[in-house]
A protein has these predicted regions:
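Class I S-adenosyl-L-methionine-dependent methyltransferase catalytic core
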Residues: 1-189
Length: 189
């Protein structure tokens, strides 16, 4: 029996209404359309000039949405080889440019990237942090992500519990949709 394939719709930009597919995988729950719409209203419809990191890429909905809206580049990190394969296939179908997909552990990738992020050109303007639902990975990722940010960078956080400011993190915007809490946060001064 073939593995089940799921779809998520890109809601804005160049690829508006295009669908990307992804396999079933434990903990993989793409951000709902209305949550993504709110997020990109917060970030702005045009992401030109921005470098983005989708650290727990999963379906790729957030990273593909950012590229569709003009982001200069997107780096997607996903641990599952099957899900990585789907991300690469979708990138090919969309003829996505300026996208790199890394099949790696997100925390290890962030740690290694922080070591090479001394140069601001290696840092990110927007980071999407939507780890597997109800995992403790968000708390582990936040300190690592703080080292990957350009001045003024924004981080989108999605989780089963409301985000709490502290340790240099400040909430800019916050919302809730069903069981999901989502926030746009900044780090540092």
């Amino acid at each position: 029996m073939a593995a089940k394939s799921n779809q998520v719709r890109i809601i804005g930009g160049e690829w508006r209404s295009r669908r990307v597919t992804f396999p079933d995988h434990e903990g993989l729950r793409p951000s709902a359309d209305r949550v993504r719409e709110t997020l990109f209203n917060w970030l702005g419809q045009d992401l030109s000039g921005l470098r983005c990191l989708d650290l727990f890429a999963g379906s790729g909905a957030l990273g593909f949405e950012a590229l569709s809206r003009g982001a200069d580049s997107v780096v997607m990190v996903e641990k599952s080889p099957r899900v990585c394969e789907a991300l690469r296939r979708n990138a090919g179908l969309l003829a996505a440019k300026n996208l790199s997909v890394h099949c790696a552990d997100a925390l290890e990738f962030a740690t290694a990237s922080a070591a090479s992020a001394a140069d601001a050109t290696a840092r990110f303007d927007v980071v999407f942090l939507d780890p597997p639902f109800r995992s403790d990975l968000l708390l582990q990722a936040l300190p690592k992500v703080g080292k990957l940010l350009r001045p003024g960078a924004q981080v989108y956080v999605e989780s089963a519990a409301a985000f709490v400011s502290g340790n240099g993190w400040r909430i800019k915007r916050q919302g809730r949709a069903g069981q999901v809490y989502y926030s746009l946060v900044t780090y540092g001064d």
